A protein has these predicted regions:
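N-terminal-proximal low-complexity accessory segments that begin disordered
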Residues: 1-25, 29-42, 50
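Catalytic alpha/beta active-site cores
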Residues: 33, 37-274
Length: 274
């Protein structure tokens, strides 16, 4: 109540001042002095930190893109939530990052090789190795609670900063399936698959590099869409429930084929200490 009264008082003072000075040439300094006089502008206080507890790090700590989508559109909502992770290989291949766009819808082997070179150069900056580069690696193994990068069968190295290793996934034969790195609280997933079309042609069998992308999403009910009547609200809450339970899906026609979109599965990894 006190804050509302203060707000009303300041608004009335602003209205009266603007009426009184209507048509006059007013300097920025005059305006600033008046705003300070009525308490609209106050002196900067000491540095402080927000102390709200139990807030997910994606909201409180991690700096990254945030998407806004209408909750009433299940397909858009799923796209936004799934955009937490995005393929760097796909992003570089399908855009003009390399200087030009793809010339056709068919896979271009030479362009693909340039994409791999570009991405490994990115890894050299994101998670540099000791005394070598990512394009020299022929194998990545988990040995004695460490991630070892092999240059040859008898020569190996590690990351310059091994604290960048968030964790990994193993195949049933104990070879690495996925290596998860991080920098500035954002993660990078290096996928390894010797049977993948890209992976089998790569020295280290790296099939893709996935970057943490849209860290969070606003599922919007009132700006990009207006859920005001009962029918719209039922759709909104049904989609929200589907996201919370993990069973939301959307079917649509693409290239004359029915496509179904669902939530990506959670990612489970092992840390170096198990």
């Amino acid at each position: 109540k006190l804050l509302l009264d203060k707000r009303h008082k300041i608004q009335s003072q602003l209205d009266n001042w603007n009426k009184k000075n209507k048509g006059k040439e007013i300097s920025i300094q005059d305006q600033k002095e008046y705003l300070q006089e009525i308490g609209y502008i106050v002196k900067e206080g000491e540095d402080f930190k927000i102390k709200t507890t139990n807030v997910d790090p994606e909201i409180a700590l991690v700096c990254g893109p945030q998407l806004v989508v209408p909750i009433t559109n299940a397909r858009y909502a799923l796209n936004a939530v799934n955009a937490r992770w995005g393929s760097l290989y796909d992003a570089v291949y399908g855009t003009d990052v390399l200087g030009s766009l793809p010339e056709s819808n068919q896979y271009d082997q030479k362009r693909g090789e340039k994409v791999v070179d570009f991405v490994k150069s990115h890894l050299d900056v994101f998670a540099p190795l000791k005394d070598t580069n990512w394009d020299q690696i022929v194998d990545i193994r988990y040995e004695n609670n460490k991630i070892i990068f092999y240059i040859t069968q008898n020569s190996s190295t590690t990351l310059q900063n091994e604290n960048q290793i968030a964790g990994f996934q193993l195949n049933t034969n104990k070879t690495i399936k996925e290596l998860v790195l991080f920098k500035n609280n954002l993660h990078c997933r290096v996928l390894i698959d010797p049977n993948h079309p890209i992976g089998k042609g790569d020295l280290a069998n790296i099939s893709d590099v996935i970057l943490e992308s849209a860290v969070s999403s606003i599922l919007d009910c009132e700006d990009s869409v207006a859920t005001v009547d009962a029918e719209d609200k039922v759709i909104a809450y049904r989609n929200w429930l589907g996201l919370m339970t993990g069973n939301l899906e959307a079917k649509f026609i693409k290239n004359k084929q029915t496509t179904k979109r669902v939530l990506n599965k959670d990612i489970e990894i092992l840390t170096l200490n198990g």
